[in-house]
Amino acid sequence: MTTSFYFLLMALGLLLYVCQSSFGNQHTRTFDTPKHRCGSEITNSYMDLCYRKRNDAGKKRGRASPLWQRRGSLSQLKARAKRNGAFHLPRDGRGVVEHCCHRPCSNAEFKKYCS
């Protein structure tokens, strides 16, 4: 193997690295990238985005909040949401399902439905 062959291999590798690093990041998601949320994803997003700030103090002390422990209980969350009206607040005449399931919404848009 000659020196020019190694040089060609190194140049090709460098070219592939530059192409991957400059064009490879266009499809990555950030924290606030709009996305579709349907079904249980709406519930999980509601728990994560709406109750995270309230529970941070408990997490720092090493305790999980009772609401977070009952995360899988959809009926309790539905009852709370119905009582608070969180999922029925009019936002331009649409609810959270119409706004975030039928078309993508960001976390900031989803937080508007927090009570």
Swiss-Prot record:
Post-translational modification: Is different from Con-Ins G1a (AC A0A0B5AC95) due to absence of amidation at Cys-114.
Record's subunit section: Heterodimer of A and B chains; disulfide-linked.
Protein name: Con-Ins G1c
Family: Belongs to the insulin family.
Tissue: Expressed by the venom gland.
Gene Ontology MF terms in the entry: hormone activity; toxin activity
Entry keyword Signal: yes
Domain of life of the native organism: Eukaryota
Disulfide pairings: 38-101, 50-114, 100-105
Main subcellular location: secreted
Miscellaneous field: Venom insulins constitute about 1/25 of the total venom of C.geographus.
Signal peptide limits: 1-24
PROSITE patterns: INSULIN (PS00262)
Entry's Gene Ontology BP terms: glucose metabolic process
One cellular component term from this protein's GO annotations in UniProt: extracellular region
Residues recorded with modification 4-carboxyglutamate: 41, 98, 109
